[in-house]
């Protein structure tokens, strides 16, 4: 071991003291005490000895040039201005083997790799626990490898605190295997406040292997291929990690690669592609399962990248077998793409919290790529865009608003108790379910009616049990003789049929037939046939345009029968109907009178014509009998 000479500064070392004796006394590596720090002199031995002293080592001002250093201890502090510069153009630089506690802080680590393809890591934590790496600046970064890497060595890295990391990469090339920070299989660790510029494939922070129970937060990636990257190289992928606060400034591909891992929570991601040359612009790509990606805001995509080339934009992309993932996104850009479900992705749910410039997620230029994966089965992907009123897909194959139970109060419901679907346009509603499905409609007082499809027939309920049925060849009531077509207050204006109506005349449906009595015919003989105009038609068209009709007056027929002591209401030819006021409730709960109370007489002409025919028969018969009684 070389002997240190006494420094020129006031005595701390003694002449003839060895380096280790000095370090044991002081543990200070600086220009006056053995390390040159002039960017030229090889300070490898001094730095290595300082680390191996197991004491805290301070790197003072200067550039300390050294070859690769391998130590079991990590206790270096640079006071903010110290620089460790790699003398070698290849290989790893600072390697710490299974350090237990310790720190690397307030220092710049300079790489001097020979080419853009030279392999090597700047700082390596090979295993270890409870180590802090803080306020470290990585400069002159190029080649392949990582600025800071933590990986297993007998056991995975545990309890690392990595914060305040800056790195700037030169020699960018797409998919070059390089990145700023890599935590391979680390557990229970914190990576916070990372600023990375121009890093290729693995971006600012990569979690890899069995990495779990880590927090990655407050990461800025400028012009990186990706910003945070969950390793997808092998079958084992990170799980149970929290990644939050990601700023992606013009990434070259995807801002966040959630990878093949599971149960990771990724939140608060801001992505801008305004000046990016990316041909593929993705906010988040997901390949694993049971991950939550919350609050992704993406901007700067208009369909063309900074080089004028066509750019495909997708804020959430589900790859391969992505399953059971959730994402909430804000696509604040004009490019059409929003969501991609690749073949094989299942049960993923995307909530579009605001659609940006889009008014439809299923337009002709569909913003959902892979919409065929939304099939309404238990494996269906689902997209909700509440601002657009679009709820696309269901994993249950149905849409439900379900409550445990419902009981109606004795009084009417208030407006707050109602469920309404309002709109100026057409409303389409499809409900599926076996051979029968129905929609039930409620009024504010609890009355309900249903519209149903049963065995291919459409049914409109008229009461709790009654209905009108529209079948393939007929419109029928639920039972015979229970409904009328029109009413006294709402009569049909007319009608058209190809054949006359068929009226039931089966003897099995009638009482014992009786002959029409002379008293009835005598009363009927006093009812005159007249011509008339309807008053509402005169009011609408004028007396000169309203048409004339032929018939009888119901009240005159009633009076004629009364003169003969007969109650005409006992007979089916005379009708009398009355009704109360009819109100309609609008969307605000206000009642509006639509039909005032009233009454109206009516005539069944087929029956009075039978009376007229019977009267004529009697008259003719009597004339024939009178003629027959005349002398021959």
From Swiss-Prot:
Q: Does the keyword Chloroplast apply?
A: no
Q: What is this enzyme's EC?
A: 4.-.-.-
**Where along the sequence does the record put site: Cleavage?**
505-506
Q: Which EC class heads this enzyme's classification?
A: lyase
GO molecular function of the protein, one example? lyase activity
Q: Which GO terms describe its biological process?
A: symbiont entry into host cell via disruption of host cell envelope; symbiont entry into host cell via disruption of host cell glycocalyx
Keywords attached to this Swiss-Prot or TrEMBL record, sorted alphabetically, are:
Degradation of host capsule during virus entry, Degradation of host cell envelope components during virus entry, Lyase, Viral tail fiber protein, Viral tail protein, Virion, Virus entry into host cell
Outcome of swapping residue 229 to F: 75% loss of enzymatic activity
Q: A single GO CC term, please?
A: virus tail, fiber
UniProt xrefs under InterPro entries: Pectin_lyas_fold, Pectin_lyase_fold/virulence, S74_ICA, WH-like_DNA-bd_sf
Where the record annotates domain Peptidase S74, the positions are 505-630
Q: Which Pfam families match?
A: Peptidase_S74 (PF13884)
Highest taxon listed in the record's lineage: Viruses
Write the protein's name: Tail spike protein
Please report the organism this UniProt entry assigns to the protein: Escherichia virus K5 (Bacteriophage K5)
């Amino acid at each position: 071991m070389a002997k240190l000479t006494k420094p020129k500064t006031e005595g701390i070392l003694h002449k003839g003291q060895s380096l280790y004796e000095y370090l044991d006394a002081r543990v200070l590596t600086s220009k006056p005490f053995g390390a040159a720090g002039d960017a030229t002199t090889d300070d490898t031995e001094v730095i290595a000895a300082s680390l191996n002293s197991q004491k805290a080592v301070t790197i003072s001002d200067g550039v300390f040039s050294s070859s690769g250093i391998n130590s079991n201890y990590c206790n270096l502090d640079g006071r903010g201005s110290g620089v460790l510069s790699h003398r070698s153009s290849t290989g790893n630089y600072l390697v710490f083997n299974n350090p237990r506690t310790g720190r690397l802080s307030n220092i710049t680590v300079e790489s001097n790799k020979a080419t853009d393809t030279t392999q090597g890591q700047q700082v390596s934590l090979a295993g270890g626990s409870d180590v802090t790496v803080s306020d470290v600046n990585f400069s002159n970064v190029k080649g392949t490898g990582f600025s800071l890497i933590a990986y297993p060595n007998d056991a995975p890295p545990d309890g690392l605190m990595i914060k305040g990391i800056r790195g700037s990469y030169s020699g960018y090339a797409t998919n070059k295997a390089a990145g700023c920070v890599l935590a391979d299989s680390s557990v229970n660790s914190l990576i916070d406040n990372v600023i990375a510029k121009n890093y290729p494939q693995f971006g600012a922070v990569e979690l890899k292997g069995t990495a779990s129970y880590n927090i990655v937060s407050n990461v800025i990636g400028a012009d990186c291929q990706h910003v945070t990257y969950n390793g997808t190289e092998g079958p084992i992928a990170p799980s149970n990690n929290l990644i939050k606060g990601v700023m992606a400034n013009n990434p070259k591909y995807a801002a966040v690669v959630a990878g093949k891992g599971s149960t990771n929570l990724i939140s608060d991601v801001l992505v801008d592609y305004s000046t990016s040359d990316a041909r593929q612009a993705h906010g988040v790509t997901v390949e694993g399962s049971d991950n939550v990606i919350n609050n992704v805001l993406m901007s700067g995509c208009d369909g063309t990248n900074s080089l004028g080339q066509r750019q495909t934009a997708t804020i959430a992309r589900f790859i391969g077998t992505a399953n059971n993932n959730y994402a909430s996104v804000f696509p604040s850009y004009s490019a059409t793409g929003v969501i991609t479900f690749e073949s094989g992705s299942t049960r993923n749910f995307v909530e579009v919290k605001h659609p940006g410039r889009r008014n439809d997620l299923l337009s002709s230029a569909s913003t959902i790529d892979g919409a065929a994966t939304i099939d309404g089965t238990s494996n269906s992907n689902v997209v909700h865009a509440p601002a657009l009123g679009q709820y696309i897909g269901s994993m249950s194959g149905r849409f439900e608003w379900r409550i445990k139970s419902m009981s109606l109060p004795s009084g009417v419901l208030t407006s707050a108790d109602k469920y309404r679907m309002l709109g100026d346009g057409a409303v389409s509603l499809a409900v599926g379910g076996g051979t029968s499905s129905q929609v039930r409609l409620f009024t504010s007082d609890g009355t309900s009616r249903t519209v149903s499809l049963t065995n291919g027939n459409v049914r409109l309920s008229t009461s709790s049990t009654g209905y009108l049925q529209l079948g393939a060849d007929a419109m029928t009531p639920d039972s015979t003789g229970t409904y009328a077509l029109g009413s006294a207050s709402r009569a049909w204006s007319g009608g058209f049929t190809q054949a006359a109506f068929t009226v039931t005349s089966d003897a099995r449906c009638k009482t014992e037939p009786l002959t029409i009595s002379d008293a009835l015919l005598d009363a009927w003989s006093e009812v005159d046939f007249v011509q008339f105009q309807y008053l509402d038609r005169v009011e609408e068209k004028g007396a000169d345009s309203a048409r004339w009709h032929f018939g009888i007056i119901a009240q005159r027929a009633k009076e004629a029968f009364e003169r003969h002591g007969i109650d005409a209401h006992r007979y089916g030819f005379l009708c009398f109907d009355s009704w109360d006021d009819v109100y309609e409730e609008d969307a605000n709960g206000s009642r509006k009178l639509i039909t005032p109370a009233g009454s109206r007489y009516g005539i069944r002409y087929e029956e009075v014509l039978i009376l007229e025919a019977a009267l004529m028969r009697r008259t003719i018969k009597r004339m024939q009998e009178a003629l027959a009684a005349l002398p021959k």
